[in-house]
From Swiss-Prot:
GO terms for molecular function: ATP hydrolysis activity; identical protein binding. It is an enzyme of class 3 (hydrolase). ATPase that regulates mitochondrial ABC transporters ABCB7, ABCB8/MITOSUR and ABCB10. Regulates mitochondrial ferric concentration and heme biosynthesis and plays a role in the maintenance of mitochondrial homeostasis and cell survival. It comes from Mus musculus. Residues 431-444 have a biased composition (Basic and acidic residues). It is found in: Cytoplasm; Mitochondrion. This is ATPase PAAT. Keywords: Cytoplasm, Hydrolase, Mitochondrion, Phosphoprotein. Its EC number is 3.6.1.-. It catalyses: ATP + H2O = ADP + phosphate + H(+).
């Protein structure tokens, strides 16, 4: 393996910027690039992050806002989407003890620093410790951001080195390598829950089973959810699993997903019932689309079966073929789904607004303008929180008012006793009096 250590004074390579103020061009001088071949191996960051020569002063990053304002220190690495290289790992030698790495807005990992050396800060005339920390990314990327964390909310961070491990971008990157859920460590989550003495709810266990199946088969979890929630998403999954053609891809991309067409809980209930009923139909009663989909691999049938089982626990057993499923029982299930598929929702445009389903006649409890299910649940939760807050404040005010009346009554009784003919003379200690009343916590 050939490894080349190059300085930052190159025409090509990633750019290094910061959210805090730094001298013009000073931060770029701290950037060191490490390039390897396509089959890259791990580097020795312990050696690469060794303290520089005494003549090379660290770069000082300072916050332009007051300490009361929340303004974390970020440094940004960007190779450009059209560049020929991608980032494998990063290392930083700075006064910040820890660092967090993000791929866009997605958290990637945290690295805790080790003490490397001590430098003298000319502005403060004091010695400052520098810590070396590095992190290998789960998947190569062309851009990332690093959050530098210091204890005590310091408004100045010294950066001595930023080492970036690069390799040539692969010609045929796998689009499924960064699928949602691939970075979720389910075993670690289970261990943490057991150590806390907590148990997952049935809905959370079903969701973890779905994510585990997605990780084992390397399928995007969004496609699984679409397969559960509607026929349009189910057809989209079938098109992805079969051999792609331009016509199929165009049709799949233009097919409106259920979450993008403004579903209500009632519409989701109907889609779920249709999916369960579909499995009970005889093989000869299907339409032509079902015959065309018969050539799929067995794992597709396993996927459909597992997803049906994951949903069936949330649906009550049907007493007759004409019975309806109340949408209120799907609320916990929808709350879990909304948190997982929120990434699928983007801003509405005119094309999606045209596809919003109109309210059906005879349906009770459906608003005239059907809104996306996530917005629907958000309004319900927000209203319930406001009502809960109002009830709590009213209860507190009532208890304070009752306590004030009780104190006033006792004070008036005490004044009457002191003014009475049988009151003790001044200077004599008062006799202990027990009203036999108890406080709410049982004390007297």
């Amino acid at each position: 393996m050939e490894t080349a250590i190059e300085d930052a004074g190159l025409d090509r390579g990633p750019t290094l910027t910061s959210s805090w103020d730094a001298a013009c061009g000073a931060l770029t001088q701290s950037l060191f690039l490490t390039r390897t071949g396509p089959r890259a191996q791990d580097l020795d960051f312990e050696q690469l992050l060794e303290p520089p020569a005494p003549s090379q002063d660290p770069v000082s990053l300072k916050s332009s806002l007051s300490p009361r304002d929340e303004n974390p220190c970020f440094i940004y690495l960007n190779c450009g989407p059209n560049g020929g290289e991608e980032i494998l790992s990063v290392g930083v030698l700075s006064s910040a003890r820890n660092m967090e790495v993000y791929l866009g807005e997605e958290y990637c990992g945290t690295s805790r620093g080790k003490t490397a050396c001590t430098v003298l800060d000319d502005s403060e005339h004091e010695k400052i410790l520098l810590y070396k920390k590095y992190l290998k990314l789960d998947s190569p990327t062309h851009a990332c951001k690093i959050k530098l964390l210091s204890f005590g909310e310091k408004q100045c961070v010294l950066v001595s080195k930023v080492v970036v491990h690069l390799r040539p971008r692969s010609a045929d990157p796998s689009p499924r390598s960064a699928a949602l859920g691939s970075r979720i460590d389910l075993d670690n989550i289970q261990t943490i829950m057991e150590s806390m003495g907590s148990r997952l709810s049935p809905g959370a266990q079903q969701l973890m089973s779905m994510i585990r199946f997605q990780q084992q088969n390397r399928l995007p979890i969004g496609d699984q959810l679409q397969s559960v929630l509607g026929s349009a998403g189910h057809k989209h999954l079938m098109a992805l699993q079969s051999s792609p053609s331009p016509a199929v891809l165009d049709k799949a991309s233009s097919t409106p997903f259920p979450f993008r067409t403004g579903l209500t809980p009632s519409a989701i209930t109907e889609n779920l019932k249709a999916l369960i009923d579909k499995s009970a139909q005889p093989s000869g009663e299907g339409n032509t689309t079902n015959h065309d989909e018969g050539h799929l691999m067995p794992q597709n049938h396993s996927l459909e079966s597992d997803l049906k089982n994951a949903v069936s626990s949330f649906l009550p057993k049907k007493a007759s073929g004409s019975s309806s499923v109340p949408s209120s029982e799907l609320l916990p299930f929808l709350q879990n789904l909304c948190s997982q598929v929120n990434h699928l929702r983007v801003g509405h445009n005119a094309r999606w607004q045209e596809n919003i389903s109109k309210p059906r006649e005879g349906m009770v409890g459906v608003p005239m303008e059907e809104q996306p299910v996530c917005s629907y649940l958000e309004k319900i939760l927000s209203k319930n929180m406001e009502l809960m807050e109002k009830k709590l404040m009213d209860h507190i005010d009532e208890r304070i008012y009752q306590l004030q009346e009780h104190i006033d009554a006792k004070m008036a009784l005490l004044v009457d006793l002191l003014r009475g003919p049988n009151s003790p003379p001044p200077g004599m200690p008062l006799r202990h009096y027990d009203s036999r009343e108890r406080l709410s916590n049982g004390e007297r």
